[in-house]
Design a protein with these regions (language model features):
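Generic hydrophobic, helix-prone segments enriched in Leu/Val/Ile
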Residues: 43, 103-110, 122, 136, ...
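Collagen triple-helix signature
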Residues: 28, 54-57, 70-73, 91, ...
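Alpha-helical transmembrane segments and their immediate interhelical/interface regions
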Residues: 87, 101-105, 116, 151
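Short, hydrophobic/aliphatic alpha-helical segments
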Residues: 6-10, 87-91, 130-136
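Aromatic-lined ligand-binding clefts that engage carbohydrates, nucleic acids, or primary amines
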Residues: 2-4
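Short peripheral tails and domain-boundary helices/loops at the edges of structured domains
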Residues: 79-93
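Glycine-rich strand-loop-strand elements at beta-sheet edges
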Residues: 6-79, 95, 103, 108, ...
Length: 268
């Protein structure tokens, strides 16, 4: 028998908006973890392996408009085994709060705020599923083997924290802020051993990058940035041999320059 483990890529954060009551971009969701035992006789001499890429960060804006959306993380696969990537963060809005990206699951991926399947309807969204981004735009929820969801971007407030993952998936990023000079910390990745990729730390400048995953560890999410005018969000932690963390959301801008770019998702 051969045990194969795979981890999906992290979704990227959305870029911040500009003018009005602008919100920071929301953060991307973390990629999922999945594993399967194969009989040696069932494997071909060569098998197709795909490594899920992290999403590229949502674009900033230099005129009065909403920020660019992030990009969902790619799926990682070995033969029939798949771990899906995390959902994209949304670009900041000029007037409303925006939801974060959902965590990747083991049966399906997440393109926006809904976590990947399976979903039990609980806050954890199932033992193997990815977490949904909260409907109230608050802190991202934790995943099990799925990824944590990204924190939302909020108008005239600090962005929300990202959700972690308890058992091998990656953490979601934290949302970009608006009108404040600090940012929230992001969710930590899960682990199937004893350590994990750390979540990006809160900061007063560009957001902190998530810690890279190591052997069988999920990468941490990147934090949203917190400059009073503009700045860029931290990238999700690269997977290494683990899931990619979600990128943080980009900072809003009050009309004197460009908004922040969303953080890139970590690779699977």
């Amino acid at each position: 028998f051969f045990k194969v483990e795979v981890w999906g890529g992290g979704g990227s954060g959305g870029g911040g908006s500009r003018t009005g009551l602008p919100s920071g971009g929301s953060a991307g969701g973390g990629g999922a973890y999945n594993c399967l035992y194969f009989k040696a006789a069932d494997l071909n001499a060569t098998e197709t392996v795909t490594i899920g890429a992290g999403g590229s960060g949502g674009s900033s804006v230099s005129s009065d408009a909403g920020g660019g959306n992030g990009v969902a993380g790619g799926s990682t696969s070995f033969a029939t085994l798949i771990a899906y990537g995390g959902g994209r963060g949304n670009g900041g809005s000029v007037s409303i709060n925006v939801k974060g990206g959902g965590g990747g699951g083991t049966l399906s991926g997440s393109s926006t705020h809904n976590g990947g399947q399976p979903d039990s309807g609980s806050d954890m969204s199932g033992q193997f599923g990815g977490a949904d981004a909260s409907a109230s735009f608050s802190t991202g929820k934790a995943g099990g083997y799925g990824g944590g969801s990204g924190g939302g971007g909020k108008t005239n407030d600090i962005g929300f924290n990202g959700g972690g993952s308890s058992a091998g998936g990656a953490g979601g990023g934290s949302g970009g802020g608006s009108g404040y000079t600090i940012s929230r910390a992001a969710g930590a990745g899960g682990t199937t051993t004893t350590t994990t990729g750390s979540g990006g730390t809160a900061g007063s400048g560009d957001g902190g990058a998530g810690g890279a995953g190591g052997f069988r560890q999920g990468g941490g999410g990147g934090s949203g940035n917190g400059l009073s005018a503009t700045g860029n969000a931290g990238a999700g932690g690269a997977g290494g041999l683990a899931a990619g963390g979600g990128g943080g959301g980009g900072r809003q801008n009050n009309g004197t320059g460009s908004s922040g770019v969303g953080g890139a998702g970590g690779a699977g």
